[in-house]
């Protein structure tokens, strides 16, 4: 090139710039959002009434517990009206969108309770629900089954089957829970089912030998993700795995990230006495990835750098 002539930089095509931006954006989404999980919880809230939740210390703790979960299944809600749940939703709504779905009051005596789903309505929606038709009256509180959407292409929906057993009939009710699974999986053609709640499946209510003979233990495909021996009770004097989560279906297994109890007294620095005002149970929870376990974050970082160098 003759000296003295101006040198103009080569113009990068718009399509090239757009492609580079798309690659970077896609990888950043995977890198930042890949670890985001969807949390499903179950909590025996121990005779939950409006009188109980309007106590400030109880309400604050309950709201913090509920706010951790994308779907929470509450048990032992004994309020015949909707006031208790509406009060909790009012406190939750300050930062996020929530809705709820509840069963009727259930029970054989004057004592009755209901199942209540509280869920993030900006992240999931109810597709279907029904009260299991317990024609033989096996359950004291028959499951209130619901199907929810999930933010996952691998598993677009999941079925939740909550159960709070009565201690004297634990084995009978848990074996009948297998029939509920068959009913719902055939009804909605969906075998990705999570059974969860206060099963009373330990200690004096169910000996280990009887536990291992349950249909949900002997039939293939069921995974008890809260391990035996995990204490789900608040009192220091007890050590029982009453509360459980049982998962079925390949989609659930592919997306499973973690399952655990939530020790809310330790997290919120409560004494045992303070915690017992909320409940004598810990919540149990399962986390589902939005995509199947794939590229680890450190590999995504490397892939991002390589892509930038190739496009640069």
Swiss-Prot record:
Protein name per the record: Deoxyribonuclease-1-like 1
GO BP, one annotated term: DNA catabolic process
SMART domains: DNaseIc
Top-level taxon of origin: Eukaryota
Family: Belongs to the DNase I family.
Provenance organism: Rattus norvegicus
Single GO MF descriptor: deoxyribonuclease I activity
Alphabetical list of Pfam families matching this protein: Exo_endo_phos
EC assignment: 3.1.21.-
